[in-house]
Amino acid sequence: MEEKRQNRIGIITMYYNSSNYGGLLQAYALCKYLNDSGYPTKQITYDFYRKTISSSKDYKNLVSFLFKRLQKRTNNLIIKTINIIHGVSELRKDRRNICAEFRASIPHTETVYNDNSIEDCNNLFDIFIAGSDQVWNPDVFRPSFFLSFVNEEKKKISYAASIGNSITGKEMQSEYEDALNKFDRISVREKSDINKLEDLCKKRVEWVVDPVFLLTEKQWETVSSPVQLNINKEYIFCYFLGDDKRHREIAQKVAKMCNCAIVTIPYMQMNYRKCDSKFGDEKLLDLTPAQFLYLVKNAKGIFTDSFHATAFSIIFNKWFITFGRTDHPRMNERITSITSLYNCGDRCVLDYSDDVVQRIFDKCPLTTNCRYESQKALQLIGRSKEFLLSIGK
C-alpha cells in the first residue's frame, strides 16, 4: 500500500528581499513550527515590490497610475539626495545584504515569483497560508496576498494576517469580501480585526498569536547571535520605527537615572532622520535579525514603538515601555492587543502627560523584576497551535 504523502505548505508573506527584523523573525517562526510539526513548509519567494498595472486595479485609470509612479520617483529622488548628504545612501542595500544569510536560513522556494508566474506554485504545494504580518494592509494591497493564484481544489488559509489600517471605499471593501470568501479558514493577529473582517465576509474569523509566540524563549535564545558593543556598562535598547522626538527624550532621561548607556538602531525607515542622528551612545547600522534578538535579550530595558520589539520583550521577560506611533496612530491596535493579552497594558504609553512620564521614571529598569505570565495568553497560544495542526486534516 502506497504511503500517503504529507501535505506540503507554502506560505506567502513579506519575505522576499526583506530587511525587516520582525517580518523575517515571524516568517522564520511559522516555517520552523510547521516543519517541526511534520508539515514540509516553505516561504514562497514572492516579489511583491513589482506591482504591475494588470495586477492592480490601476489599469482602470492609467493616467492616475503613471502620475502616482512619477510622484513617487520624484519623492524618492529628494530622499536619496538627503541620504547622500548625510552618508546613509547605501543603508537600504546594506541592510538587505546583511539580512541575506538569515533569509536564506528560512526554507523557501529557489524560484522568485511575480504576479505573472506565481500560479506555478500550485505544482509545489497542497496547502497555502497567507500571513503573518501586514499582508492584508490596504496600503499594500496585492491579490496574491489573498491567494488569488491558488487553484480551487487547494486549501487556502490565513494565519495571523494583519490589516494595519482601515478598509475604506466600496470598491476596496468589495475586493476584500470576494477574496476572503474564497478562504477555507481565516485567522488574524489583532482581535480588533475580527469584527472588521466578519462584517465584510460570510466567514468565521479566528484570533491567533503572532508566529513568534509559537516558539519558546529557549528556542529564540538559540537563534540569537552576539553583538560586540563598545560600551562598558549596562544598556537600554531603543528601537524606534517612528520619528517622535519625545520618545527619545524620555528614554534618555531614564537611561541617565539608571546610569545606563543607550544602544539604538537608527534610521529604521532606511532614510536619514534628524531625530536619530544625535541619539544614542552606540548606533548600530548593520545588524542581522539574530543580533536584534541578542540586543533585546541582554538589555536592561527596552524603549520601542514596534510590535515585534514589544513581543520579544515579553518573550524574554524584559522591562519595556512601548510608545504609540504618533505618525501612524491606527497601528497602535496591535500594541494594545498584545500588551492587554499579557496583562501588561501599563507598559503601553499612548499619551505624554506629566503623570504618565513620571510613572515611567518610577519604574526604573534596574529595580524591576519582570515576568509576563498570562493564562489567557497560554490558552491562545494553545488554540493557535491547534489551528495550525488541524489544517492538514
Q: Where do the protein language model's features map onto the residues?
A:
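Active-site anion-handling motifs in enzyme catalytic cores
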Residues: 1-393
